[in-house]
Amino acid sequence: AAKVGSVFQNPRTQFFNVDTDSEIAFGIENEARPPQELIERVEQTADDLRIQKLRNRNIFELSGGEKQKIAFASVYAMNPQIYLLDEPSSNLDMTSIQELREHLRLIKKQGKTVLIAEHRLYYLMELADRIVYLEKGEIKGIYTPEEFRQLSEQERERMGLRAVDLRAVFPPKPHSIAPIPVLELRNVTLRYKKRTILHDIGLSAGKGEVIGVVGHNGAGKTTFSRALCGLHKDCDGQFLWESKPIECKERLQRSYMVMQDVNYELFADSVEAECSFGIRNPDQTLVNATLEELGLSPYREQHPNTLSGGQKQRVAVAVSMICGKDLLVFDEPTSGLDFDSMTQVAGLIRRLSNMGKVIFIVTHDFEFVCRTCSRVLHFDEGEMPDDVPVTMDALPKLRELFSVSDGKER
């Protein structure tokens, strides 16, 4: 433990403090370092990792990506010889993933050993020395990055692996039928603790639309999602459904939200029971079919808390299919998912779209957006500067929003 530093997939499970500076300092304190050294190490860590804006913050008010940065910083401050990172990019926006890549490059130059369990591969291809492929508890292959790039797309997908180059990911052909508008937001302003998060937002959404919501960590995407579902009440402006105003209570009745941290919404003693929890007269045939489609049938009797992060995510997505609500909001539904699980979730969302559901997806996953979304909303600096269709014509703008360069990824 003195030589190995671990960053968990869910950073919340490794926090011991309520503010960021104390969390970064926690490990050093337990080494009984002198107070002055402790202060210097915290300051040096914040400078090295460029997280000065996250200092002296309440951990409970951070976004998922910001929590991930603090978890990494708390390990970096202890200066371990070996880093173990479990899905370190799962909660990060594309800019933060670029920063993570630079942090990994930094500790590699320092002579540290880094082991990363990861499904997103593209940001590691210039850094990794070896790529170890595991299947069912066994090592099935060890590759150099160059050997890994030579794998065909079919072979990579058979192995359940994500794209190694986001420049090779393209949107499908657009739908020719315009959706029927049902949801409208007029001059909506959202606040959190008296601070304006989003200002004067206006948009409409139609039946069957799948709308991506993007922006940097802390841009207000989750607050926007909660407001759509009637869970965030500190707002001005109008929400309309089929041209009629709907207040928080009715939005809550019409909607279902899959949270970024699904541990907050798993209540039952088994996966099967979770899929019908709180639903009157659940359709057992639909429950069985959904479990089968998402590869959850083998786990139907297991307690949800015994599942992996990706499996828990699929359970929450399964509930969204079964609950019968009109408005569905997914907050990072592909966090921690491999290629197979991601395509399963994408297929399920397309089915929900075909059923006429209005779907919003908060995501940083360019590959997933190209498979599922019809348009993308971009939040930045409290505003919504972009509403971009997911089409080949708009591909340059989409790549810009997701920081995918025309040359080598930055």
Please annotate each region the language model reported:
Residues 118-119, 363-364:
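H-loop/switch region of ABC-family ATPase nucleotide-binding domains
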Residues 214-216:
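The feature captures the beta-strand-to-loop junction immediately N-terminal to the Walker
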Residues 58-62, 66, 303-307, 311:
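Conserved ABC ATPase signature
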Residues 229:
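Helix-to-loop junction immediately C-terminal to a conserved catalytic motif
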